[in-house]
């Protein structure tokens, strides 16, 4: 009887729409392959998880055999994704870069970043206030659209996301540009909403750095958002940004998402 009761409780808690995304991406610069990666996102009624991995390839692998992993998890609170932990590791032939962030209610409670930023006098310091009301970089890539209409809509682009990546605090702003239709080699075929992206550094950066100035002045970066089935969450299908070497593109070759109905989850308990 206890097992039946637990199953019934779990089923009732899982009644809201839920879904899973399995995506694979190819990265290119000026049309030249430089890397590939995978991303798995699971959206539950009260929580979410996301994990990613990637590696360089082609000409880029000749210069650096970099590979990386990342993971984020959190809660669904008031219809929004609120992260509780984030971890990322990037390893190349010479270095290991690691970031760990713990959060509660949108506020950073603990974090480590190795190697640490150089304590340059011109660097704008990150304050305690800068680490409040933020999300991690992976969570920032997911967009939850409120309401009851089609989530693949201009509304998905109307947002400004405060991000802390363990070293730098910045805002990611977006605006609606247009609607498009896409077809993955495997998985999703249908409409996407195209958003212009804007980068605004807040702290942890050196204002005179050329890379920072380039990102601040950039006006041609865009992301194409596609739906995760069974949810009101959208994820990137395509991302493009001009670089000094040519157009940088991250494009999904696989974008397979499926709703996970409550009765299916109850059956597995």
Task: Please report, for each region that a protein language model flagged, where it lies by residue.
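Acidic, serine/threonine-rich low-complexity disordered tracts
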Residues: 15-105, 149-269
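Long, charge-rich C-terminal accessory regions
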Residues: 137, 141, 147-149
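C-terminal segment of classical bacterial N-terminal signal peptides
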Residues: 4-14
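Internal, conserved structured core segments that host functional sites
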Residues: 91, 95-139
């Amino acid at each position: 009887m206890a097992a039946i009761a637990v199953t019934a409780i779990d089923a009732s808690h899982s009644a809201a729409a839920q879904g899973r995304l399995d995506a694979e991406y190819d990265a290119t610069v000026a049309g030249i392959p430089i890397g590939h990666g995978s991303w798995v996102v699971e959206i539950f009624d009260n929580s979410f998880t996301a994990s990613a991995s990637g590696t360089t390839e082609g000409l880029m692998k000749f210069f650096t055999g970099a590979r990386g992993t990342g993971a984020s998890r959190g809660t669904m609170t008031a219809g929004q994704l609120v992260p509780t932990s984030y971890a990322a590791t990037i390893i190349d032939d010479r270095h290991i870069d690691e970031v760990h962030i713990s959060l509660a209610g949108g506020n950073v409670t603990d974090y480590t970043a190795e190697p640490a930023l150089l304590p340059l006098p011109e660097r704008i310091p990150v304050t305690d206030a800068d680490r409040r009301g933020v999300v991690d970089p992976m969570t920032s890539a997911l967009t939850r659209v409120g309401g009851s209409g089609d989530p693949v809509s201009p509304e998905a682009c109307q947002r400004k996301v405060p991000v802390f990546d363990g070293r730098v605090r910045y805002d990611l702003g977006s605006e609606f540009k247009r609607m498009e239709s896409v077809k993955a080699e495997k998985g999703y075929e249908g409409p996407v909403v195209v958003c212009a992206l804007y980068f605004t550094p807040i702290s942890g950066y050196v204002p005179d750095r050329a890379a920072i100035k380039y990102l601040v002045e950039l006006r041609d970066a865009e992301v194409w958002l596609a739906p995760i089935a069974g949810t009101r969450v959208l994820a990137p299908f395509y991302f493009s940004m001009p670089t000094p070497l040519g157009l940088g593109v991250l494009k999904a070759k696989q974008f397979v998402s499926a709703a996970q109905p409550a009765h299916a989850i109850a059956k597995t308990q």
